């Protein structure tokens, strides 16, 4: 898993560095061109004044995102950098093809623990009143978006949060994820606002009301988002039949009852899965070794030291439109040594 994780980090950092260096080059190249024009050519005073004014404006009004960007769109990532902009905010329209990331400063001694990003800091957006964002933290994010995934880890004294909305959203909704205010800016709440459109599958082509999948958290009613909500003590084996273009999911946690000693295995499912071809001999492998164009949520990079793993034990797999052969994969929900086995029969052709 580490080699895939390392490759994703390298690609992201390289793209960001490339964009920054290119912007810096254009900025100074244009400035240098203006100065050279002044000394090389004999120009009228009006043109001289105009170019000089343009040069001053460049230095004053060009955003200082050359060294530190607040909003970065690179590859399949949208990154809101509130670590370097502790009084700022970002806004983004959700796109399933992009991973949304939020960087927050860690305010030590602000809370009882700074070991993880507090998931209650993400909630339904109810607007701004008197220049303050309306705090709706008591409305837990799962009440608003069952099946949402928040993954966080700490890197360079910064909370690195990845946000994955579910594939079934009953109505247009806006959520916000906030950061703690730094000392001296207590009256200002930095936040990321995410606008999410009503969705019924990736392309609004979902058959039925839920994503195909096994929910060993047994969430039902308004919390249900997968087709099979079951208890591992009653149904230790859950089987799903899936076809090219389908989305499948797994969940291990219950949203209303705290379950002790629960984990998703592999912890990077569906990035890593147990795989077999028509036999019951399974090997652990990256899913892209089996289905090269498959997409999985969350991505492997989001599992790096994730501190919210006990609360968001959910994953999704987008099966490519074409696969070469029938395959069998599985992940498990582990409960203090007992397991719920989620088996996915993925067929190369859809049944008539």
Swiss-Prot record:
Cystine residue pairs: 57-90, 104-179, 122-177, 214-238, 252-333, 269-331
Record keywords: Cell membrane, Disulfide bond, Glycoprotein, Malaria, Membrane, Repeat, Signal
Glycosylation sites: 89, 97, 111, 156, 160, 254
Pfam families from the UniProt entry: s48_45 (PF07422)
Record localization: Cell membrane; Cell surface
Domain of life: Eukaryota
GO cellular component terms given for this protein: cell surface; plasma membrane
The keyword Glycoprotein appears for this protein: yes
Gene null: resulting phenotype: Attenuated parasites that cannot commit to infection, even when they encounter with hepatocytes, resulting in continuous traversal of hepatocytes. Cells lacking both PBS36 and P52/PBS36P are severely affected in their capability to develop into liver stage parasites and abort development soon after invasion; possibly due to the absence of a parasitophorous vacuole membrane (PVM).
Main location per the UniProt record: membrane
Record-linked InterPro entries: 6_CYS_dom, 6_CYS_dom_sf
Ranges for domain 6-Cys: 53-199, 210-351
Record has Zinc as a keyword: no
Gene3D superfamilies in the cross-refs: 2.60.40.2860
Signal peptide positions on this chain: 1-29
Function: Involved in sporozoite infection of hepatocytes and replication therein.
Protein name: Sporozoite surface protein P36
The organism of origin for this protein: Plasmodium berghei (strain Anka)
Lineage of source species: Eukaryota, Sar, Alveolata, Apicomplexa, Aconoidasida
